[in-house]
Amino acid sequence: MISPLLQHISSPQKLRSLSLDQLPLLCDEIRNRIIATLSLTGGHLASNLGIVELTVALHYVFASPEDQFIFDVGHQAYVHKLLTGRNTEAFSNIRHDNGLSGFTSPQESNHDIFFSGHAGNALSLALGLAKGASHGSSHILPILGDAAFSCGLTLEALNNVPSDLSKFIIVLNDNQMSISENVGNIPQGISQWIQPPKFDKIFQKIHSWMRKIPGFSRQKSELLHKVDIALKSLSHPLFEQFGIHYVGPFDGHNIKKLIPALEAVKGLPYPVLFHVCTAKGNGLAEAEKDPALYHGVKAYFKNHSPKKKPLSSEVKTPSSFPQHVGHILCQLGEKHPRLQVVTPAMSLGSCLEDFRKQFPDRFTDVGIAEGHAVTFSAGIARSGTPVVCSIYSTFLNRAMDNVFHDVCMQELPVIFAIDRAGLAFHDGRSHHGIYDLGFLCSMPNMVVCQPRNASVLERLLFSSLLWKSPCAIRYPNLSTRKEVSNPSFSPIFPGEAEVLCQGDDLLLIALGHMCDTALAVKEQLLDHGISTTVVDPIFIKPLDTELLQTLLSHHSKVVVLEEHSIHGGLSAEFLLFLNNHNLKTDVLSLGIPDIFIPHGNPETILNMIGLTSDQITLKILAHFNFSAPIPI
């Protein structure tokens, strides 16, 4: 049910028609809308509950889209969407088919300036906007939250802010969290800069006392508030060294104080850092108690009763690739007493909490700093210590040069556990892990592989410590299984593929979890009288050239199947192999087309790009002219 005030807010202009006294009720309605929606769809919950009052205040004081808001990270923009004409059925389906993106998207609204999904870029983008065009009477407001302020790119941009840049307000949404608790010196430093709570309490008492004095007018009260803001701006000189005027901190949940404070900094002829303190998960008791757990949720309500998803330590039998990785790393930690694990702010998502708790001195979360995570891991490896760098595929893109310069060029045996390889579905274009093979396979010394199930994953992780070379083990966030329960197994070495089944008419090479799809296609082709050899290459680089040459001696028709961009993946490596060995064969390459893939449900996305088993079967029949395509 749409709320009484919120249902009338079709634009920020409509918001500004409300009185100040109505805004707290509106904030409650917004929270209820977000909680009710995400209980059915899942999404980024805690961050958006924490930014409600701040977003309402920003839209109340400034005039978007003339005043430009840039959210960092973009997942904290749900409130912004509700206030900018998107409180519709599309919001009710957020991150799903026919729904809004879970991040800012210019395709949805001119109130969204950029697509956003990765952290730390807002300040650079905002400075570019200011440099590239005269914004006249308009303001530019990068809104930094969830540890975006401590990203290296943010600090680089901070060093580049002109001291005479007017109408430029950096809003720091300080919730002392990223996805989980902040790490490192910068967030701790910010906490130390915050004024003691006693200061605000004393000032409130003075204000309350003075209001009782006869003749104390509203104008004098406003003047006193301006004195409060001035004192807040004088108390922390650090940003002044950057030429940035600091104001704060302010209570991010007191909208009646936020609005006059924002009015006071509006139109200033120099850059301002507006520091707001919020509580991630505010307004939902469970999320306030455990904001990390409620950062990103699945549909977690049943009969309006919150259902907690289990922490990794509560998972007795791993069922997904990330859970198996977390379990195997704990086994490796026991076997190798010097093994180190490094991650850039993805301990919970990548199921590393058990390792962190079991081996706290051998676990490092570097925060949202992917380049540093890679180079830090390189330093560990150079010391002779085994190290696993656990990182999402989409975030590894940000550290490509670190992989090249600090790992591969140095020939250091860093083991990259690359999570979320493949389609991210609900998170959309910024989070699909479908581009990493293009640069990983181009780097000398790098071994690249992908397991089809938990058994192969286990062999790869245990064996990778024997390879003594940089290696990337990529895997999706999908359910998987172990084929055997026997803990003893033989090691596997780079360039070893596996034949899953033999046939005479077609060779089907499928990468990782796509082997399951390939085996389903094999059965469908059998209905057409076509027998298929299915091969799991395991290694994209190096390929098992000996096995492939043997198979190609009696297969003239080949299909390469992968959930990766058709450019730069397994198919590209296979075609290079054919060219290098002067082999001629008919190859059908099936992968992800050269477009940005939107968000949506798995079935919808796979159908859109033609990677369902039915579609693959029809493409094979048509391409090789086995028979006229028959709908299945």
UniProtKB/Swiss-Prot annotation:
One GO BP annotation of this record: 1-deoxy-D-xylulose 5-phosphate biosynthetic process
Catalytic activity: D-glyceraldehyde 3-phosphate + pyruvate + H(+) = 1-deoxy-D-xylulose 5-phosphate + CO2
One GO CC term, this protein: cytosol
Chain positions recorded as Mg(2+) binding sites: D146, N175
Source organism, top-level taxon: Bacteria
Binding site for thiamine diphosphate: H75, G117, H118, A119, A147, A148, N175, E370
SMART domains to which the protein is assigned, alphabetical: Transket_pyr
Keyword Ribosomal protein on entry: no
Protein name in UniProt: 1-deoxy-D-xylulose-5-phosphate synthase
Gene symbol of the encoding locus: dxs
